[in-house]
Amino acid sequence: VNHYSTMWETGKAMLVCIDKVTCVKMYNLIDKYWKLKIKEQENEMKNCLDEQDEKEKSNKLQWLKETEYAVVVSEEQNEIDKFKKWDLDIIPHREKMKKRDLATEFKDNSNPFRLAIVCAMWLTGFDVKSLSILYLDKVLKEHTLMQTIARANRVYEGKNNGLIVDYIGVLKNLREALSKYGTGTNTEGGDSPIGEEKDLIEELVEAIRERSE
């Protein structure tokens, strides 16, 4: 919530969870902290420096209040009882998925449904050009990993790049996938295009130093 609310002008986002139960758990947590973030932003409105600052804070507050997040998971038999065992209620989420065309809404950049919480659906073959941030909390490998990270890599007006936030640690799998699938017709694989962590940190420090001079 903290991260996405600071990136609020960048586009839509998707959280990939390990399973369906975790999707609903994360929805509940996001809902809790999103409401707190709204209150926090309302308090920020009391400390505006000037008209421009007031306008920016007001726009962000409106975005927070309008933004909708939703669970998108496939239906299964006896799912109500399954979720009850975890003290969770899938019914309101399932009703929303059935009554609304969430896929179309999510693809519409002007629609306030901005954060999708998924575990398997929408990871492949589902293009949302305005999707800018992908939060990964599920171990993915090879083709599925490549397809998933490609969700945030579509070209869109005003979108400079896609951002992958890795909570689970898929760097090793990403290196392997890029080496295997990122070499065109070379089936024997190749070198990983991902730099070493030490070198990347040094580059980041140097870039920060140059900007501060």
Task: Please provide the spans of the model-predicted regions.
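Switch/connector loops and helix/strand junctions flanking conserved nucleotide-binding motifs
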Residues: 23-25, 78-83, 126-127, 142-147, ...
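Conserved C-terminal RecA-like helicase domain
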Residues: 1-118
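Hydrophobic alpha-helix feature that most strongly marks membrane-spanning transmembrane helices
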Residues: 5, 35, 107, 111, ...
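Catalytic cores of large soluble enzymes that bind and process phosphate-bearing ligands
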Residues: 18, 22, 94, 98, ...
